[in-house]
Amino acid sequence: MVRSSPLLRLVLRTVVVGYLVLLVAWPVSLVVTHTFDGGFSALSKAFADPEVTHALQLTAIVALSSVAINLVFGVTISILLVRYEFPGKRLLSALLDVPLSVSPVVVGLALLLVYNPRSGWLGPALADAGVQIIFSTPGMVLATTFVALPLVIREVVPVLEEIGDDQEWAARSLGASSFQTLRRITLPGVKWALVYGVVLALARSLGEYGAVKVVSGNVVGSTQTATLLVDQRYQNFDQPTAYALSFLLAVASVVCIVIVSVLRPKQEA
Amino acid sequence: MSIDISHITKRFPSAGSGKEPFVALDDVSLTIPSGRLTALLGPSGGGKSTLLRIIAGLENADSGAVTIEGTDATHLPAQKRNVGFVFQHYAAFKHMSVAKNVAFGLEIRKRPKAEVKQKVDDLLNLVHLTQFADRLPSQLSGGQRQRMALARALAIEPNVLLLDEPFGALDAKVRKELREWLRRLHDEVHVTTIFVTHDQEEALEVADEIVVINEGRVEQVGTPDQLYDAPANDFVMRFLGPTTEINGVLHRPHDIEVFTHPGIAGSIPARVVRELRVGFEVRLTVELLDAAHEEITVTVTRAHHRSLGLRPDLDVWLAPTHGAVVPVMESVTA
């Protein structure tokens, strides 16, 4: 290890801690203090509001659905990327990063262009079949899934690469079918990466705003998620409810992270 | 009953477009007898591991057929071949205990619990890992992990046991212990075993039969003694041990006698240039006193070295040892 002077270490520490306090800890703590300005009244008032409970329910439904979809497709795509060779593999890998680099608003608009029931590319056909995507839950799930798409994959791919395919081949030679190998060898091998990816995806999905706002239509009591409601209440000077909802969203994310750090083994061999 | 490999060819696409594909195996035919311990020996990249993986079904040949104990296995997937495979880097199931690792193949086959437990106990006893049954693989040493992998492969009572450089990742001392142990284990279990190695000493020490593979072709098949005493060609001769060339003929450096006086029939004059003592032997670098003045290596025991009074700049006469040269056996057609 490189030895550094105590003074330099002190300065570095101060800079880092100061940076994090100003950027993260201070603003978030303000949300907490504002939520509890009037004791628990803001929270209890928020929970009594049917629009709030509906928005929270909708957020939970959208987030959990998109996490489930991202889990299934994330594992499939990761295995495809690591274990198989096919033309266009590098293109697919690059495409997977698009949701990270493109603004969520653009994602929402793009989905609108495809699924809009009147003028969309695929929307009218789906509308004729009685399936409504835009301005309803499926569209919001779609947008959220798109935005959180790479999170599971980017966690699982490096672990799959690191563990290699020897264990899988060993299982096959011992008589396991490909499904048995997946269930008993591959999935347990990437378990922690999966848990971590799912938690990241869940946190991201709970907090998604831009893409959902475009595709949902932001209809109060119908297609309004918690983040959309926070914004609306804040604009309409109902700050206590906005703070209470923000607090709940932040708590959900923090709980996710805490669960992972408790579950994750100290030192994975 | 045996393993028959007929006309196996395997090519791998080369990195970079437009290049010729790399030929890993070039029309290889081979019969491996049952119940024996056979070594596939050759330099890295010679195709021996590819051949092993094709026998196991981990890799598909471009053409040719594999027959295991009378069954055509060419198009059977790996899990239907009943083949035990041991990997160089153990391929231990990291999230399972040692006992669970060994039980894996039996649980997949849905054997009764009592039978599985009995079998696992027996196998752990066989590989001396009984007291480690509940540990995770990460808590074992490399040698222990490889013994666990062997027990796991033996649990399914395979028709054939395949080992891919099984001791390659271990340090020299453990490697030596484990190969002696493998030899004894094979004498107890008698399962047809093929192991891949690039270490000629390992092959000579452990195997009943050695197949020398180089550049995708079989160079020679035979017992260790046949290969050492009667190599089919210069490649086999060079690969199995050190060689020295006199007048275009290869000899082992320890199969050349050194005299300090002339007059021996067929002897050639030379002069000692350097000497290097390594343990029980002395490696002499001698210069042939012919037109080319070639330098060659000759090995003598330290006692012989002392009794002859060998030293640099001494004139000596060299003659191939009588009885070391055996007529070259019929070359094996690959």
Which sequence ranges carry the predicted segments?
Chain A
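Transmembrane-helix boundary motif in ABC transporter permease subunits
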Residues: 1-5, 65-97, 109-113, 125, ...
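Periplasmic/extracellular loop-to-transmembrane helix junction in inner-membrane transport proteins
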Residues: 2-10, 31-68, 83-86, 232-240
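Interhelical loop and adjacent transmembrane-helix boundary motif
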Residues: 5-6, 43, 50, 209-258
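Transmembrane alpha-helices
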Residues: 14-19, 68, 92, 98, ...
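Hydrophobic alpha-helical transmembrane segments of multipass integral membrane proteins
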Residues: 22, 57, 61-73, 77, ...
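Membrane-helix interface segments
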Residues: 84-92, 121, 136, 166, ...
